[in-house]
Amino acid sequence: MQDVELVDVGGTGAARDPVALAGRHRRTARPGRSRTPLRRWAVVSLTVMLVAGGAVGAGLAAGGYPARPRAAAGMLHPVDDPPWTRWHAPVPRSDDLLAADGVLLGTSVREGRFRVTAWDVATGGRRWDQDLGPVAGTRPLTGCLPDRDGTSAVVVCVVEPPVVPTDPARPSTVPFPAPDERWARVSALDAATGAVLSTSTLVGRLAAVERLADDVVVLSIAPDGHPQVARYSAEGGHLRWWYRGDEPLRLRSGIVSGSELRVDDAFVLVQGWSASVLDAADGSVITTGTPQWYTIGALAQGVFGTWSSGQGGTVRDRSGAELFRSSALFPSFTATDQQPPDVLVLDSGGSVVGRSLPDGDELWRLDTYRAVRLRVDGKLVLVGVDGYQVADVRTGDVLWQTPGRTLMWWAPLTDGRLVLSAGRTGSGTPTIEARRLADGALEWSLPVPDGVRAVTEVGGHLVLRTRDEILLLQ
């Protein structure tokens, strides 16, 4: 039995109100929604009966799980009311979590074998458990690949079986250290049943595998050190396209040093001693950089960026043509809806900069020690170790910030209307605090259950993790 308490946030007081207009802001150019009134929650205690092994509270067992879509990957499904623990399941924190259509998945290696377990999102009941065979002792590629939205009906997993010793009669012909040639098995599973839909095999000096829709994109190293990138269908392993780089990757101490593969709906970015940007649809080369290039990643739809020590950052359009240069770097968003699409946000180290697309005019500059992490509904959430602030994407104006100082021991999350973050009561009890993105007003606050070590988003679901359990809140 577990008590879930809603902390009273009624009345007025300093702890309730956000602090507005913090940080030094310089607007270079100023181009030109209120929500429903704050709902005040009385102190309530909800006693939830939890069945061992992960059953739901009896009152909601028959109810359907709301399936309203998120605005963007990395965001929570809409949180209309204070959430409560819908179910819990035994999952060690060392296991990886991901989501698929109607299920939450845990992957693990137990006794040298790779296993995937699926729990029904609505009930917490175990749907299926699949053993995908033995794995190698070192398994950098082994795992299930999350799809962008966590809603695919296909689960794609890669397993590296134990390495077979090299045949002395066939020594390696690689002229410098490189990853050993090995093979990996790609399995496509039905998310609803766990049934194996198909298996295929990857062979070569494998460096990285990423998922793109229901396909896999594979980076391998040719015997002469050149990168090879291929896109295969996860079901059946059919080749979509193949690319070989003109420049060898940088190799060191038997590994591919600094190599990286990034994918999104528009681009495939291959980074090593040089950088190449490929069209995700057909593998055609959009641009290939000099050996001094460093590929940062896609920034927005149809726009990507590169960086070099000599030129700094360069923003490029869909064809690879240079739009403008900037010494600022490109922030790593945990969630973004890319709105508005004609404003690019850059991190200049000690300040955040807004620039227009496609011309690159500087619109505003905000001096802050906090880092941009969320971009949604025309607003930025900038996070520091002691709190966060919300700024307008078009103007750079700081709209509000969290009152006081609270250790952000987990990264703030959003559903597009609320920002959920770490909070603390006057007595020091850790809480989950929900503030309206529009104005910072506190809507509710929930105590964090004992033993919780992480609060995160998995496929749009709010998930808490202890050392040996997961708790799904709804």
Predicted regions and their residues:
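Secretory-pathway ectodomains
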Residues: Q2-Q474
